[in-house]
């Protein structure tokens, strides 16, 4: 099962440098904190619509593979993050199987919990980079994050109803 927003997320073209954009737009795109929290600050109830979750092989993550360790399997989670039931963001998380040990096993059991609620409660969370991307007028970003030094890649596409626009 897929969703058109996730197809568009995978088509994002990334900027080599941070583009000169409106400061309010950059504030959203370069946010270091939880996007879930930012959406809740808009006075909205945030929920997750699960699109796909499970183990995949390298051939299913061609866009992410160069940014992650080469492994036999990866945990893939694709969701829509909704505010008061309206989709504001499409998210795709790719986690190498080697990351899924110790406390990070919880990444497989998030269910309808937003990823940000888990990630941003961890004292071991670090971010290697944020890249800004665009496709067909929609903005997105991807970040390589680390929990206890173990990598995962998060890609987010801001949907038309998002307050980013």
From Swiss-Prot:
Additional remark text: The sdgG mutation, which suppresses a conditional mutation in dnaG (DNA primase), has been localized to one of the ubiA, ubiC or yjbI genes.
SUPFAM superfamilies for this protein: Chorismate lyase-like
Record keywords: Cytoplasm, Lyase, Ubiquinone biosynthesis
Pathway assigned to this chain's UniProt record: Cofactor biosynthesis; ubiquinone biosynthesis
Subunit annotation: Monomer.
GO biological process: pyruvate biosynthetic process; ubiquinone biosynthetic process
InterPro entries according to UniProt: Chorismate--pyruvate_lyase, Chorismate_lyase_/UTRA_dom_sf
The keyword Cytoplasm appears for this protein: yes
pH dependence of function: Optimum pH is 7.5.
Family per similarity comment: Belongs to the UbiC family.
Provenance organism: Escherichia coli (strain K12)
Protein name, per record: Chorismate pyruvate-lyase
Pfam family, one: Chor_lyase
Residues the record lists as binding substrate: 35, 77, 115, 156
UniProt effect for mutating residue 156 to K: Loss of activity
